[in-house]
Design a protein with these regions (language model features):
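C-terminal extensions
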Residues: 83-112, 138-187
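Catalytic cores of alpha/beta
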Residues: 6-22
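Residue-level signature of tetratricopeptide-repeat
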Residues: 130-131
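Conserved strand-turn element in the central/C-terminal portion of the radical SAM core barrel
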Residues: 1-11, 32-39, 43-51
Length: 187
């Protein structure tokens, strides 16, 4: 799908992708940010959409295909139907659904663990394997995950309880993307 060539918002694009997966049995949908060309139709926009939008759509698509998210869940809460470009869709979903967290890493089913920001499919598989033998502690989790700071506010272990972290107003700032801003070469 070409992103940004028309007025379609991210909600429409994700819903269309979900219908393509359901009705045609597609294994993957590709997204490409619109790139304007000189002497094009006047109905096409003159500026290209941010590449981060394409990236967020790929992340949302991944959540639908591998993490069990429904299309409505991903864009739920977005007033204009657009994904938040500042944070990934999984983190944005978790922040909108704070009442579901924190979850116990030693008891939660696979489907619930996959919804925790910072836990991917491989890490969840390792957690499920490890917790059969021993109750996981925060140090064990630190060895399994890429960034414990991203996971910590959303989980409970025998030696860690995030009292007040999940309801903290500063949580959004702490978990904000630390990446650099995309520069515009032709500005």
């Amino acid at each position: 799908m070409i992103i940004g060539a028309d007025e379609a918002n991210d909600r429409d694009i994700i819903a269309r992708s979900a219908s393509l997966y359901a009705s045609y049995g597609l294994r993957r949908v590709y997204y490409s940010a619109f790139s304007p060309i000189p002497s094009a139709s006047q109905s096409l926009p003159l500026r290209r959409p941010p590449l981060m939008r394409e990236h967020r759509l790929y992340q949302a698509d991944w959540l639908m295909r591998y993490y069990g998210f429904a299309a409505e869940e991903i864009v739920d809460g977005a007033s204009d139907g657009m994904l938040d470009l500042e944070r990934d869709p999984k983190l944005a979903w978790a922040l909108r659904n704070r009442a579901l967290f924190p979850i116990d890493v030693n008891r939660a089913p696979r489907e619930t663990l996959l919804r925790v920001p910072g836990l991917g499919a491989r890490v969840v598989k390792r957690i499920l394997t490890a917790r059969r033998h021993v109750a996981l502690r925060i140090d064990d989790l630190a060895r399994l995950v890429h960034s414990l700071d991203a996971v910590r506010p959303f989980v409970v272990t025998p030696d860690w309880r995030p009292t007040g972290l999940i309801d903290s107003a500063s949580l959004v700032g702490k978990l904000a993307s630390r990446g650099s801003r995309q520069l515009d070469l032709f500005a």
